[in-house]
Swiss-Prot record:
It is a multi-pass membrane protein. It is an enzyme of class 2 (transferase). This is Glycerol-3-phosphate acyltransferase. It is found in: Cell membrane.
Amino acid sequence: MLTIILLLIASYLLGAIPFGLWIGKIFFKKNLHDYGSGNTGTTNTFRILGVKAGISVFAFDLLKGTLATLLPLFFHINGVSPLIFGLLAVIGHTFSIFDRFKGGKAVATSAGVILGFSPLFLIYLLVVFIIVLWLFSMISLSSVIGAVFALLGILIFPSIGFILTSYDLLFSIIIFVLAIIIILRHRTNLKRIKNHCESLVPFGLNLSKQKEK
């Protein structure tokens, strides 16, 4: 039991590591909270610190979720689903004890959790993400629609035997929680999308015809 408790705490602390914030401060002498959206996640890192830093932060944030999900396998823990460990990493990422309980928008770390538990489901979500990004050139919209399609996937796929061969109650609950976290963390982005002032990326068709900011 003590091992399980320690690993659950470790999962939160692993997720709480604010790679974007630390990389910005150490290598660029910039506090991401003072630039752009003020967020320490992948998108703001790309915009403020550049491609290399953005890719690094994305990879680290993704791995946080995957490693936390795999911790019980590494330590041969039974009786607690790997998804619980992954969820704690996402909570740590979103409400980091190392950053005054601030954090990212949970997209990359949630993707890491799904990668560690159901890689095929992540591929499905990645396809959705890329299609939406190509059409509208908005990372935020792609993330939110990806979260919605995750909810649709856990409802529909088990009934048709596609990707998810059977209903998994805990997986469904975790996906629901992750999707809600992602959507709520993008509230301000959704308002900007509604007002046609959301930031765009130089990729895709931009069917909204909004000017890049």
